[in-house]
């Protein structure tokens, strides 16, 4: 099983960051790669579309409001992986209430791709996503 993790310090309090990204259907609010998110199954599943119209279906598998993190599994996607589970987490930065550290991590099994290829793919997705979050917070 492969894994990757990317962290980024962003210029907003952990509470403000979580209020933006903590909703399972909130990806279009901060992630340009996902312009559409539709909640199904009572909000436990999100049906996403990317700019090319490809469908990604994800299931919420863990949510913790107090600790500011959630995990999800990909059920369907155009990515060469299976067994994908990812977590988005907002951390406090000691001694600072005006910034937060956001960590996006995942583990997955390559499917018709090498471990390095899928690790590079998701490292890039997470990095670009956290860059987009930073840009949203500074706009």
Describe the predicted segments one by one.
Residues 11-14, 62-66, 90-101:
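A short, structured loop/turn motif at beta-sheet edges
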Residues 28-80, 91, 128, 136-139:
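Glycine-rich portal/gate segments that line the openings of hydrophobic small-molecule binding cavities
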Residues 1-41:
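Hydrophobic ligand-binding cavity/cleft-lining segments
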């Amino acid at each position: 099983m492969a894994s990757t993790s990317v962290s980024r310090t962003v210029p907003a309090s952990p509470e403000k960051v979580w209020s933006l990204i903590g909703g399972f259907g909130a990806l279009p609010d901060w992630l340009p790669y996902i312009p559409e998110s539709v909640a199904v199954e009572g909000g436990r599943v999100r049906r996403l579309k990317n700019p090319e119209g490809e469908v990604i279906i994800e299931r919420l598998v863990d949510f913790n409001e107090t600790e500011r993190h959630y995990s999800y599994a990909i059920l369907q996607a155009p990515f060469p992986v299976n067994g994908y589970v990812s977590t988005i987490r907002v951390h406090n930065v000691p001694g600072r209430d005006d910034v937060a550290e956001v960590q996006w991590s995942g583990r997955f099994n390559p499917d018709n791709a090498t471990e390095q290829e899928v690790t590079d793919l998701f490292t890039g997705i997470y990095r670009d996503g956290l860059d987009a979050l930073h840009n949203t917070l500074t706009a």
